[in-house]
Amino acid sequence: MKLFFRQQGQGKPLIILHGLLGSSDNWHSLGKLFADSFSVYIVDQRNHGQSPHSNEFNYKALTEDLEEFMTENKIENPHIIGHSMGGKTAMNFAVKNPTGVDKLIVVDIVPKKYLVRHDRLMEGMKAIPLEKITTRTEAEVALAGYEPDPAVRQFLLKNLSRNNEGRFTWRVNLPAIDQHLQETGEAMIYKGVFHGPTLFINGKKSDYYHVTDDDLIKNIFPNAEIILLDTGHWVQAERPQEFAHLVLQFLK
């Protein structure tokens, strides 16, 4: 699958992978900052952003997409940053290709199985009457009945775009994501160990990490460093300056 990506900067390659229902757009500001030091590739994973849609949606497909992307763009031994679902893709890639990654940064996700509790968000997105609404405000009003947090609503509504007729449409492949939602919570699908330098940046207020996960992390990523920031799940959005500082210090 030929993935859409944004590239900027020169130097050592740095690949950034967004989370579920996100896109390369979410990483624009940080990507620009990192481009002062690296050749940054911000990728839209399948069924997200401007990348193609497919009924197949699991970590095997996402990992193979990343392998194909690197081959096609002649990227060797990059640093990789992955948030949430993107972090799971990055971890699977690193374990499957242990000599194919220089340094790995995983943001607010660990290599365990999760019960994905986004059913309400999916219901809300599917309930927006795209054929009737004419403004994003109308879309947000419809979504507010399902999601009380305005920041989360704005995040989800970044997936709305207008087609050639001027009507709203979803960039994300909602049917495929909805069908395979629990698969995004799967544990590691590849077995092995990645011995390269690894940094886990987790949110203190997030449900995705607990201190009891440290042993599991160290079993698969023995050279992992684990750092907590005072955030929820969207670490890089809530504390962008602290996050960027940690990333740049680690990648030096």
Across the structure, where does each feature detected by a protein language model lie?
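Conserved HGGG/HGGXW glycine-rich cap/lid loop of the alpha/beta-hydrolase fold
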Residues: 4-52
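Flexible "cap/lid" loop of the alpha/beta hydrolase fold
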Residues: 92-95, 102-134
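Gly/Ala-rich beta-loop-alpha elbow adjacent to hydrolase catalytic centers
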Residues: 82, 86, 90
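Conserved alpha/beta-hydrolase catalytic His-Asp/Glu region
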Residues: 116, 131-185
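Alpha/beta-hydrolase fold catalytic core
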Residues: 1-15, 35-38, 75-76, 182, ...
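Active-site loop/oxyanion-hole signature of alpha/beta-hydrolase fold enzymes
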Residues: 28, 32, 41-82, 245
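Catalytic histidine-centered segment of alpha/beta-hydrolase-like enzymes
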Residues: 231-244
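Conserved serine/cysteine hydrolase catalytic core
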Residues: 165-219
